[in-house]
């Protein structure tokens, strides 16, 4: 296990500090509600409170009490929702107010009390979860089950089980995701036959506690049963919760913080928790011990990862994993190669810019990871950046919008001119200056990978591009700007304006985005003074 110590710089922990670290419950510092206060403004409160395991296959959220699977900002979850109620749902009783003072949000445990008096708790395993709903003594104990396109539902009151599946139609894929579920309860129930609105209502009598064990599978119903048997059979809520707490303490304990206030420690470990959610594992182990995963309606053998969100993470998250979670990073770079093999594209966040898988691979190689073929990676990267997914689709604007992050929009101009002109005559290529800068960074990473591995062919190809960022730098005022086909910089440039030739930023923010050539940027800006 790798452990690091954070003061102002990383250093190795002494043995006595390690012993002290083992005795701490670091999950107590984590607040999964941090960053979840959503407001209408863009990028405010986009963190979902989740219970899951480190890079866990599944995540669960108190939105209702739901399985959200691959949820991310701008990407919906898989939509299996449990709602504890004290009366049958109606437009008037659809929601209950949460007592915010009652909320405990930890990586391994979530608890809250609602205005109807129900205390709700949940805790995760790798692919499953357990729930405990405690109802007021004199109230009805009801549980509503709903989901996106929920179908195939069978309620077996004798076995205290409900099975079925939901279908999620993603905004990032043309294929529909089918997720099978198996729910087992620790109390007898009756089923309300009125299933209007796609909701199944279970009645457990008066008050008391209702325990629920939930397993899901993206492969089939049989796999859900296998997973249930492996992860939940015979286990109580407290046992699952404690095992999850130990897993999280093991991961959070890889970095120890010294000094600072309790509030600063809570902030640090709450953020560290977020770094350990992705990339998420997305494979299941069948009854014969084979690791399998479902993709695009087919089932394949091996391990697979989802939710890398490379544009947001390539320069920070994966570099951190290389230090504190190396074994998983070794497996992830293999998964990157597998993803490209299956889909024809590197994962790139579907609407974001750049081809940052090559950055992750180059960084991994530089730090000694050897679980992929660098020549194969460079060849696939070259094919990736000399085409665009938009050019391969003729299915309307919806699909065009949601594949524009795959491949390299504007690659023709980028290779011919060394930058992508702005403004364009059409809306085909947006955010042209940001694209130029990030394409340049990725080509630099490819050049470095080729150089580290002695690949003269690709080293010569990418050496032509490693200073392209300079082509959109205006020495007159020291900013990157939009530049038209005649070489003229944008006369209406405003360094504070969001958008235009930039993506998710303005001229000031993109001014400091050449992380691969700090010395060159110092020179462009007139020197160190």
Please identify what each model-predicted range represents:
Residues 358, 442-443:
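TPR repeat positional signature
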Residues 1-22:
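Bacterial Sec-dependent N-terminal signal peptides
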Residues 13-17, 219, 364:
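Residues within alpha-helical transmembrane segments of multi-pass membrane proteins, especially transporters
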Residues 21-318, 322-359, 366-437, 448-471, ...:
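Accessory carbohydrate-recognition regions in carbohydrate-active enzymes
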